[in-house]
Amino acid sequence: MSDSAMEPQNPLTSGDFTAADEPFRLFSEWLKDAERSEPNDPNAMTLATVDPDGLPDARMVLLKGLDDRGFVFYTNTESAKGRELTAHPKAALVFHWKSLRRQVRVRGPVERVTDAEADAYFATRPRLSQIGAWASQQSRPLEGRFALEAAVATTTARYAVGSVPRPPHWTGFRILPVQIEFWHDRPFRLHDRVVFKRENPEIDWEKSRLYP
C-alpha cells in the first residue's frame, strides 16, 4: 500500500463531503482545492440578477470576501448589476471548477457592505485599479478606447499625489445565502448533490441530498 493510500482523507473534499453539516466550511475547503487546481481565477463566479422588466442578467465577477454572513464582491453601483441589485436586492451565484468537476450554487437576498469594509478593500487594490474605478463610467456607452484612456490620464493627474480615495459609487455587495447547493460529478451522470437551506441567519441550516 502506498503512503498516499494510507493518508486519511478530508471528508469535506473527498467523496464523503455529503456528511458535512455546515456549508461555509465546506465551501472554504472546496475553494482551497480550486486555488490549487484552477489555472485562472478560482474565485470567479457567475452573478445572476434581474432587470426592471424581470429579464435575467448574468456576468462573471470575483469573490472578494467570505465569512459566515455571506459572499462579497465589489463593483460600481451605477453599473447594470449595481442598478439591478439596488432595485431588486436578490441574486444567485454559480461557482464552477471544471478541473475538479465541482459546482456550487448560492441564492439569497443582497445587502451593501459597510463603508468601512468598502474602504478597507479599496485600499488594497492596485493604484491603477483605483484610478480605473474613477475613470470608467461602467456599463455606459463608450465612443472609443481613446475616450477611456483620456479619462484614465485625467484621473491619474488628479490623484498624482497621495492616496486615491474610494469613489462614492463604488462599494461591495454581500449575498446572504438562504440556499447553498454542492454538486460533484460522478460517472454515468450519477452525481452527488447536497443542498443546505435556511430562511434567515438566526436558525440552523437544514441539509438534504438531491437526486442527480
Curated annotation (Swiss-Prot):
Organism of this sequence: Azorhizobium caulinodans (strain ATCC 43989 / DSM 5975 / JCM 20966 / LMG 6465 / NBRC 14845 / NCIMB 13405 / ORS 571)
Cofactor: FMN
Family indicated by similarity: Belongs to the pyridoxamine 5'-phosphate oxidase family.
UniProt xrefs under HAMAP family: PdxH
Residue ranges, annotated region (Disordered): 1-20
Organismal lineage: Bacteria, Pseudomonadati, Pseudomonadota, Alphaproteobacteria, Hyphomicrobiales
Positions with a binding annotation for substrate: 64, 121, 125, 129, 189-191
Enzyme class: oxidoreductase
Keywords, sorted A to Z: Flavoprotein, FMN, Oxidoreductase, Pyridoxine biosynthesis
Tagged with keyword DNA damage: no
Tree of life domain: Bacteria
Protein name listed in UniProt: Pyridoxine/pyridoxamine 5'-phosphate oxidase
Cofactor note: Binds 1 FMN per subunit.
Keyword Flavoprotein tagged: yes
Annotated pathway: Cofactor metabolism; pyridoxal 5'-phosphate salvage; pyridoxal 5'-phosphate from pyridoxamine 5'-phosphate: step 1/1; Cofactor metabolism; pyridoxal 5'-phosphate salvage; pyridoxal 5'-phosphate from pyridoxine 5'-phosphate: step 1/1
Chain residues that bind FMN: 59-64, 74-75, 81, 103, 138-139, 183, 193
Function: Catalyzes the oxidation of either pyridoxine 5'-phosphate (PNP) or pyridoxamine 5'-phosphate (PMP) into pyridoxal 5'-phosphate (PLP).
Pfam families the UniProt entry points to: PNP_phzG_C, PNPOx_N
EC number in record: 1.4.3.5
Catalytic activity line of the entry: pyridoxamine 5'-phosphate + O2 + H2O = pyridoxal 5'-phosphate + H2O2 + NH4(+); pyridoxine 5'-phosphate + O2 = pyridoxal 5'-phosphate + H2O2
GO biological process: pyridoxine biosynthetic process
Assembly description: Homodimer.
GO molecular function: FMN binding; pyridoxamine phosphate oxidase activity
